[in-house]
């Protein structure tokens, strides 16, 4: 990981604290309150407090420390992580049918993230501002408007990038975790009995004591590990070691101290269940805590927003989402991007969620299904990658996946009970994203197959043109070609209608590799097909944005000199119609594809080609 080489371990570890652990680090704001709020038929009872604390502690140890930090983070693609990366790794050495299944699982996991990302900013910021209920009860009616104002400002600054503000994230989050630890330790010293809950026997006793209702209570316990996927998804930004060091040295101790501190407070003062997090603080510290909590939740929300930008770019580059405008907000960091359409769709969705649910406790019912669903899929995909790619023994992989699923499946099942009380929200959003991604991928493949099914051989056509050339005009023409040995539609139509050809013709194919980055040395491959025809294949990773000017520069280094303002770019523009023979459900999918195609970013804008150098030739295609 290059970042680790450029910066010292303490510096990059501090940066990881500021970004990776925002979501899981703000969970103490609401987790224990939701566990003991009385919704499961029992209130602040000693056995319940000890049971929940034991469950939270061992979930943090098993799921975060053991599963993700020890095992899942081994699965990286050139240092990058995330559910789509894991999907790609798992499908490398499998059959075509198995690969299709793994792709579906990966897309479901990615869709779950889109469902979760709408809830995270809403519940985080609202739970922080709800500290006003303790500090200034008269301001309670303003919690929803204030939450919207804070998030509006956050979404508005996205287009400017977070480079300057981002430098403050790490020290603020470090201060947040230190305050969590101090407040928790202070409360534990007043009631050290609570440390008994470190014994897993209390977790077992909880299930025996509360029987059936204890299973439903797992749906609240899982709030303590929301954001765990960020550890894996952000691996490419910081590297494995800094993320692990940050967890074991700062984050885990702070979280455990704070949860147990809240438990100690509740054992002595059960009425503190109204908001045990803020009631840990002395009266004089309530306003500073409210400000710090709001800043921490804004940072957690920023991490989620950046995550959805990164996932969207990856999905676009892998062909699962339609092309859209991606703006780089930093000349130094390629990972800092802004996608306007995603930003504002997410903003409006978050505002609607805040207005509809009104309180973070109501949102807690919607939280968890997407998180635990992704955990289940991660276990399956990781086990497949371990067996197929690294050839781990069947016994080891079997024991590992059984251990993971013995935790993941009960957590997911418990959260399914929330389906009608809010859980439908992330599932619905995830379903919409899954339909969009599968529609774009499958219909785009169908379109390309229809366009090329009657195509003649490119080599044969070039040979024919060299033997009997049409009228040649001065200059260079570039034709975008999706497949190597297929004649571009724009070239066919130009010959058919204009009956001319430029003196030099370049067939340009853009290829997305199964890697986040492609080294500049391997960026461009040139092949001279004839005295006047050249084939250029430009390779990019899924974290990179293709740029024609850069491609021309690499071509010049290879001996093919091109000047942007002296080159004509010919592109085909498909006018799509839906075939009458398609079943009704495929016709619906076709209409969705037409809508996506109509709103997709045009090729000249994707590749930063000057509009006055582009010639589009239309063709009608039935899909």
Swiss-Prot record:
Transmembrane intervals: 9-29, 49-69, 101-121, 137-157, 163-183, 212-232, 247-267, 276-296, 337-357, 363-383, 395-415, 419-439
Subcellular location: Cell inner membrane
Pfam families to which the protein is assigned, alphabetical: K_trans, K_trans_C
Keywords: Cell inner membrane, Cell membrane, Ion transport, Membrane, Potassium, Potassium transport, Symport, Transmembrane, Transmembrane helix, Transport
Membrane topology: Multi-pass membrane protein
Predominant cellular place of this UniProt entry's protein: membrane
UniProt xrefs under InterPro entries: K+_transporter, K_trans_C, K_trans_N, Kup
Coiled coil: none
GO molecular function, one term: potassium ion transmembrane transporter activity
Protein name (database record): Low affinity potassium transport system protein Kup
